[in-house]
Amino acid sequence: VGQTMSRAFDSLNLSGRGVRIGVLDAGFGGFRTDRWTRGLHVAAWRDFTGGDETAFIDDATDHGTRVCTNLGGRSGDTIRGLAWGAEYYLAKTDRAEVEPRAEERQLIRGIEWLLAHDVDVISSSLGYTTFDDFSGYTPAMLDGRTSTLSRYLDSLLTARPGLVFVQSAGNAGDQAWRHVSFPADVPQVLTVRSCDSGGHYRTRP
């Protein structure tokens, strides 16, 4: 409760109704059978990785489903996510088992698709540092304007100040990288990093 401020949210009688949320991830497996997400209103979904659209919610990767649980998960009167009444748009732009540089472009295509649906909030769990061909970036480039995605988002969010873009910090906090991944370095992006129950962060700014 302390980390999500759900008591304050409940006191205002909010549910996310009237809000359009776009979610960018590597898979939404089990979305329609999971107890926390099967009741969410999904207005549209799309796969930008060349996968089978008919098998979108049967994907082997369920990270996006877990994210949606945190955003709006609800089972009966038990609530896991605060925006259980929002309208959701799901975009798969990444395949978890590979890291080609093309996934940067796929993520941008996913964002453009979400914008065409006039979403209010975009949540992305996808960040990049090094690709399968050993190309990539260095921590010195974390300036909000060097990487392909950082340049794109800096321009987009400057032009659309009302759009909320939430980005995961990345999973390299306890690895050699030790910093956020791109595009979490963009100043207008709301970057979320993980912490334990004691409030200790895994990733340095």
Residue ranges and their predicted role:
Residues 1, 46-47, 125:
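A generic structural motif
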Residues 2-7, 173-175:
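Short gly/ser/thr-rich secondary-structure transition/capping motifs
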Residues 8-104, 117-121, 131-133, 159-162, ...:
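Subtilisin-like serine protease catalytic core
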